[in-house]
């Protein structure tokens, strides 16, 4: 059985969900309507083919369940993350069988959490509502306590994915990668290998690279991040610092950034929006 897991989505906590949605719309993305989880976090989705960005906040009247022994609380992790910062909180890989992945994580020594099943209502572009449902299996890197990791199995994908919402005016075509930063990336090699299911990965003095079936997961040193992105990684300790999106026409996208007065820099054939201008996470745009 092939256990190599592709990128599924990124959890991006923000204080003002509508402001974040408006910012991504300025960048030329189609942003979905506001949805609410049963426990009270609320999200807006930016879809790509097979992957998405989850802009998320804690809604009014939220009933957040705390973490318990053997039980990971998604809502509590988002709440605690937002109490300290905005940004990129959780890396999510796709699963075809969350319970099998939970067993694999337990065997590898990175699990120990009960699987979590839930459903919520989703609004389609025409305003109608459908139900989407998921099963999650969580993993933990004890050396990266402020980074969340889980896999997501979709039970009603036909109600979630929408090709029309993937036709972004800015030409964005894929979530190409994510970047974690750590003082010593090698410390996270064993965990990331078990989490992604990738045994043959690249390890250099700059960091680690895992080529998943959909997108790259990399863990870089602070110095390597500064070299690759042209900016320093914000924050301390192991943390998720950036995401990379592929666009069809980089020059056209740059013209959009200029027209919208979005601050960015051009670096190593990429356009980069620093985290202080993008709700706490660096955004890198590359050509397809």
Where are these regions (language model features)?
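Short beta-strand scaffold segments in enzyme catalytic cores
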Residues: 44-46
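Glyoxalase I/VOC metalloenzyme domain signal
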Residues: 1-7, 13-32, 48-117, 123-288
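Short acidic/glycine-enriched loop/turn segments that link adjacent beta-strands
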Residues: 38-42, 267-269
């Amino acid at each position: 059985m092939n256990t190599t897991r592709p990128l599924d989505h990124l959890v991006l906590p923000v204080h003002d969900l509508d402001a974040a949605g408006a910012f991504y719309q300025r960048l030329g993305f189609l942003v979905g309507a506001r949805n609410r989880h049963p426990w009270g976090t609320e999200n807006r989705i930016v879809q790509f083919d097979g992957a998405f960005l989850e802009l998320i906040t804690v809604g009014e009247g939220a009933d957040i369940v705390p973490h318990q022994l053997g039980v990971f609380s998604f809502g509590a992790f988002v709440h605690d993350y937002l109490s300290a910062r905005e940004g990129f909180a959780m890396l999510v890989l796709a699963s075809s069988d969350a319970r099998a992945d939970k067993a694999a994580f337990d065997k590898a020594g990175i699990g120990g959490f009960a699987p979590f099943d839930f459903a919520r209502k989703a609004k389609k572009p025409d305003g109608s509502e459908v139900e989407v449902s998921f099963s999650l299996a969580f993993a933990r890197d004890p050396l990266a306590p402020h980074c969340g990791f889980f896999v997501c199995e979709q039970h009603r994908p036909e109600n979630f994915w929408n090709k029309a919402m993937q036709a972004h005016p800015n030409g964005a075509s894929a979530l190409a990668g994510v970047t974690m930063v750590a003082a010593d990336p090698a410390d996270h090699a064993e965990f990331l290998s078990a989490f992604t299911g990738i045994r043959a990965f690249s390890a250099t003095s700059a960091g680690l690279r895992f080529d998943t079936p959909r997108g790259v997961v990399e863990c870089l040193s602070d110095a390597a991040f500064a070299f690759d992105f042209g900016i320093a990684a914000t924050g301390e300790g192991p943390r998720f610092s950036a995401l990379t999106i592929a666009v069809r026409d980089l020059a056209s996208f740059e013209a959009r950034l200029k027209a919208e007065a979005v601050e960015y820099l051009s670096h190593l054939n990429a356009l980069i929006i620093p985290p202080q201008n993008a709700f706490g996470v660096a955004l890198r745009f590359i050509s397809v």
